Amino acid sequence: MAKLSLFERRRQRVRSALRKRSGDKPRLSVHRTGKHIYAQVIDDADGKTLAAASTLGAKGSGANVDAAAKVGKDIAAAAKKAGVTTVVFDRGGFLFHGRVKALADAAREGGLEF
């Protein structure tokens, strides 16, 4: 078995815990890079993306807490438009701090429940 990085081990641990308790709820998946942040609402049963939002194409920096909060509001609005109100939050191996936390808080304020 190949050695996994700390991030990959954390991601596997988070995803396996989500699979056990998510049931049939869609998953709000977050991906963070040095320049941008991405969010998707994914229906794992059908393997389809129901809603998506990111900082791509936005003016200014996409790598700060304010940009992450805007993505959180955008993903909440897109999920509501798709008929989704309850999700399971998938931080994807990233620590729940900073930009990831800002996105989650803004999505909750936007009406998503998790």
Swiss-Prot record:
One of its GO terms (biological process) is translation. It comes from the Bacteria. Keywords: Ribonucleoprotein, Ribosomal protein, RNA-binding, rRNA-binding. CDD domains: Ribosomal_L18_L5e. Gene3D superfamilies: 3.30.420.100. The keyword Transcription regulation does not apply. The keyword rRNA-binding applies. Pfam families: Ribosomal_L18p. HAMAP family: Ribosomal_uL18_B (MF_01337_B). InterPro entries: Ribosomal_uL18_bac-type, Ribosomal_uL18_bac/euk. GO terms for cellular component: cytosolic large ribosomal subunit. Part of the 50S ribosomal subunit; part of the 5S rRNA/L5/L18/L25 subcomplex. Contacts the 5S and 23S rRNAs. One of its GO terms (molecular function) is structural constituent of ribosome. It comes from Erythrobacter litoralis (strain HTCC2594). This is Large ribosomal subunit protein uL18. Belongs to the universal ribosomal protein uL18 family. The gene is rplR. PANTHER family: 39S RIBOSOMAL PROTEIN L18, MITOCHONDRIAL (PTHR12899), LARGE RIBOSOMAL SUBUNIT PROTEIN UL18M (PTHR12899:SF3). This is one of the proteins that bind and probably mediate the attachment of the 5S RNA into the large ribosomal subunit, where it forms part of the central protuberance.
